[in-house]
UniProtKB/Swiss-Prot annotation:
InterPro entries the UniProt entry points to: KsgA/Erm (IPR001737), rRNA_Ade_diMease-like_C (IPR023165), rRNA_Ade_Mease_Trfase_CS (IPR020596), rRNA_Ade_methylase_Trfase_N (IPR020598), rRNA_adenine_dimethylase (IPR011530), SAM-dependent_MTases_sf (IPR029063)
Species classification: Bacteria, Pseudomonadati, Campylobacterota, Epsilonproteobacteria, Campylobacterales
Alphabetical list of SMART domains matching this protein: rADc (SM00650)
Catalytic EC class: transferase
Keywords: Cytoplasm, Methyltransferase, RNA-binding, rRNA processing, S-adenosyl-L-methionine, Transferase
HAMAP family per UniProt: 16SrRNA_methyltr_A
Function: Specifically dimethylates two adjacent adenosines (A1518 and A1519) in the loop of a conserved hairpin near the 3'-end of 16S rRNA in the 30S particle. May play a critical role in biogenesis of 30S subunits.
Protein source organism: Helicobacter pylori (strain HPAG1)
Compartments where located: Cytoplasm
GO CC annotation: cytosol
Main localisation: cytoplasm
EC identifiers of the protein: 2.1.1.182
Listed name of the protein: Ribosomal RNA small subunit methyltransferase A
Molecular function GO labels: 16S rRNA (adenine(1518)-N(6)/adenine(1519)-N(6))-dimethyltransferase activity; RNA binding
Reaction catalysed by this enzyme: adenosine(1518)/adenosine(1519) in 16S rRNA + 4 S-adenosyl-L-methionine = N(6)-dimethyladenosine(1518)/N(6)-dimethyladenosine(1519) in 16S rRNA + 4 S-adenosyl-L-homocysteine + 4 H(+)
Amino acid sequence: MVVAKKSLGQHFLTDESFLDRIVDALPPLNPLKLVEIGVGLGDLTLKLLDRYPLKTYEIDSSLCEKMRSKLKVQKKPFKLELVEKDALFLKEEEPYFLISNLPYYIATRLVLNALKDPKCRGLLVMTQKEVALKFCAKDSQNALSVLAHAIGNATLLFDVPPSAFSPPPKVFSSVFEVIKESLKEKALASLAQVPFFEEALQKGFETLEDFLKACFSSPRKTLSNNLKKSVSYKEKLDKVLDFLALENQPTSVRASEIKDYLKLLNYLLKG
């Protein structure tokens, strides 16, 4: 019997109906490779192997061994490449699509890593509902939603109750997807003055991420007050005020009320 490790944030999805819904929600993948973070008890992995070849990253050696044992008994039409490694260091040489029931404690960081990775063309993941709502929020409600929608289209798909897991978590989970869009990627890459597109895209994403940290540092305060405290952007405050005037927005605007962060950041970087 496998005991969930609290240190790794393990809650295993065991409800067959929700496992099927996740697999059915995958978009057409060809020619993308499918990459999974976390093998868990193998329930989702085995269902995926009925339809796709799969590469899975798993840090827990005992779960890796259990998965290898299962595959000796349950023959699948597609092959599993099981990598015993921390997914924080996930690095693929070819374009891929990410799928995962992410550990709550590290979910945000793993999603941001995938969004930042030019090789990742999209993702379908389950996180704590609160995190999913932040990534999928419309307009500029928070920094995570701005980042997700700056590079693609983020959509909340469905909720998953605690009873679907073993052991059950204390909160609801949600499944959401982010599908990257080439036009948005080009706009992000234009923020960086480097010759190679993938490098420019990653640097552009990091530039926007850094800017948003300053803008949303105190969400209830005005954008101007937040940027005054930023070492990187306080000297550009006059240009921010110029931009707000051009956009017919008041100087008392909050970060969540900015209509177009890429437009604002481009304006700041030009001067």
